[in-house]
Amino acid sequence: MSDTIRTLQGRVLSDKMDKSITVAIERKVKHPLYGKFIKRTTKIHAHDEQNQCNAGDLVTIRECRPLSKTKSWTLVEVISKA
């Protein structure tokens, strides 16, 4: 295992849960046959201790120990508000 902590940037899709947010991580993947770059989206559940995020915010999250069945990321900062 490496000692670096994984951090990602994404947009908040949902903040309806208590102390939790759903973040959409967008990445570009090259199509194997045609070579065109395609956008792929991954949804990640993250922990938001102060409930400071709203839907549409641009945020930075980092990996942590598992907090629940689906949450293993925590909010680091809100880059821009929606």
UniProtKB/Swiss-Prot annotation:
Organism of derivation: Shewanella halifaxensis (strain HAW-EB4)
Family per similarity comment: Belongs to the universal ribosomal protein uS17 family.
**By its UniProt entry, which NCBIfam families does this protein fall under?**
PRK05610.1, uS17_bact
Spans traversing the lipid bilayer: none
Taxonomy of origin reads: Bacteria, Pseudomonadati, Pseudomonadota, Gammaproteobacteria, Alteromonadales
Database matches in Pfam families = Ribosomal_S17
**What role does it play?**
One of the primary rRNA binding proteins, it binds specifically to the 5'-end of 16S ribosomal RNA.
Name of the protein described by the UniProt record: Small ribosomal subunit protein uS17
Q: Name one GO molecular function term.
A: structural constituent of ribosome
Which InterPro entries does the annotation name? NA-bd_OB-fold (IPR012340), Ribosomal_uS17 (IPR000266), Ribosomal_uS17_bact/chlr (IPR019984), Ribosomal_uS17_CS (IPR019979)
Kindly state which keywords UniProt assigns to this record, in alphabetical order: Ribonucleoprotein, Ribosomal protein, RNA-binding, rRNA-binding
What is said about its interaction partners and assembly? Part of the 30S ribosomal subunit.
Indicate whether rRNA-binding appears among the record's keywords: yes
Question: Which Gene3D superfamilies does UniProt cross-reference here?
Answer: Nucleic acid-binding proteins
PANTHER family, A to Z: 40S RIBOSOMAL PROTEIN S11 FAMILY MEMBER, SMALL RIBOSOMAL SUBUNIT PROTEIN US17M
Query: Which residues are the signal sequence here?
Result: none
Q: Which GO terms describe its biological process?
A: translation
GO annotations of cellular component type: cytosolic small ribosomal subunit
